[in-house]
Amino acid sequence: GTPYLENLVSTTNRKLIKLFDRDDVAIYNSIPTVEGTLMMVIQHTDYTIHGSNVMVLGFGRTGMSVARAFQSLGAHVKVGARRSEHIARITEMMFSPFHMQDIEKEVGNIDIVINTIPHLVVTANVISKMPAHTLVIDLASKPGGTDFRYAEKRGIKALLAPGLPGIVAPKTAGQILANVLSQLLAEDVIARKENGE
């Protein structure tokens, strides 16, 4: 949390729950995020997802969902990761894996790049090796992981799209949080009963 929240929690003897850091919230939120990503790709390209070459950067909760969705629509999906267990899972799920340090070698035939890594990975060097028609969708939290200034200079369309759940499916996004909060409150009631409060 922020220093203000951390201070508030320590001075009031309260518990801070970082909802958006929770695995369950992130996994549920990956559903509207994927739908929003598909919507953006369809809006900003003049070719089908089917048969296109898609590169997903990061294989966390969102990256995995994005890769699966694009593969299920017939895209050829390459996934970049750093951790060996992610490379193994990428391989097991029938995506084409690559190590992030090799991104410059891998991007030469890519139509769509979808970044989920919240630090600069789509650098000027990477962008300079992309085909001119490549679309970059950056799902990482602000400021994203893309050199947007260089992309614009090169004529590559690069879009920063954090917070898609609240934009494309606000009712679902609210329901996800309501469900998790209800679960947390129920767990708290049970814990208090067990502690005799």
List where the protein language model places each region.
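Glycine-rich adenosine-cofactor-binding loop
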Residues: 50-71
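Hydrophobic anchor at the start of a short beta-strand
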Residues: 16, 77, 97
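A glycine-rich, Thr/Ser-enriched phosphate-binding loop motif common to dinucleotide/cofactor-binding enzymes
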Residues: 23-42
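Glycine-rich helix-loop-beta junction characteristic of Rossmann-like nucleotide cofactor-binding loops
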Residues: 44-49
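Conserved Rossmann-like nucleotide-cofactor binding loop
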Residues: 62, 85-86, 142
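Rossmann-like adenosine-cofactor binding region
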Residues: 90-166
